[in-house]
């Protein structure tokens, strides 16, 4: 008897395929092959591919944006929040972030989700910089965020890249008290 797959099993399988093979691998046939189940299980959980893709995007937005922000905001001051957010962001699955962004170049729905996520992340960073007393919080947030996105694209990541990026951002902050 086949093992039943949960909705989360399907999401996990899709994220793994997306990370390894790109969005073109997100087909019902490829997913059922990956999970070794019938298409009926897929349709039971999602109804169609569009609903499945929406579930993937929702999971990604929650795990890669809402959860790191939630974790950071458990801290009681802006400096600690910034440090906690930095740790949470460093621990993200960056190849998956790249795969979602590449998908967004080809799919308008994904692009809309990315625009929303980018806005949420920028607002979070702007708030952190404002709370730390920086005079140009929007500019600093934009610089920090675009450096984060760009740094993910350098392949392979040079040794010490995360540290170098952090040092550059710290230097910038010193000039914007």
What are these regions (language model features)?
Residues 1-5:
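N-terminal intrinsically disordered/low-complexity leader segments
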Residues 6-9, 13-51, 55:
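Helix-turn-helix
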Residues 9, 13-21, 67-71, 100, ...:
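Solvent-exposed, amphipathic alpha-helical segments
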Residues 55, 66-99, 144:
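Hydrophobic alpha-helical connector segments
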Residues 65, 92-98, 108-134, 138-142:
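Amphipathic alpha-helical packing segments from all-alpha helical-bundle domains
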Residues 104-105:
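Acidic, metal/ion-handling microdomains and their immediate structural contexts
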Residues 111-115, 130-177:
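Hydrophobic/aromatic-rich alpha-helical bundle segments in the mid-to-C-terminal region
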């Amino acid at each position: 008897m086949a093992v039943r797959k949960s909705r989360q099993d399907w999401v996990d399988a899709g994220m793994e395929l997306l990370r390894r093979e790109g969005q073109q691998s997100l087909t019902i046939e490829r997913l059922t092959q990956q999970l070794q189940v019938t298409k009926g299980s897929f349709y039971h959980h999602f109804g169609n591919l569009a609903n499945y893709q929406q579930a993937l995007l929702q999971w990604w937005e929650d795990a890669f944006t809402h959860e790191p922000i939630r974790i950071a905001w458990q801290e009681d001051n802006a400096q600690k929040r910034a440090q906690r957010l930095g740790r949470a962001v460093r621990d993200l699955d960056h190849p998956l972030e790249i795969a979602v962004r590449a998908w967004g170049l080809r799919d308008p729905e994904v692009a809309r989700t990315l625009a929303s996520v980018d806005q949420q992340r920028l607002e979070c960073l702007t708030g952190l910089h404002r709370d730390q007393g920086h005079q140009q919080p929007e500019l600093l947030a934009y610089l920090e965020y675009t450096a984060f996105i760009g740094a993910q694209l350098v392949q392979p990541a040079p040794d010490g890249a995360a540290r170098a990026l952090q040092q550059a951002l710290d230097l910038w902050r010193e000039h914007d008290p």
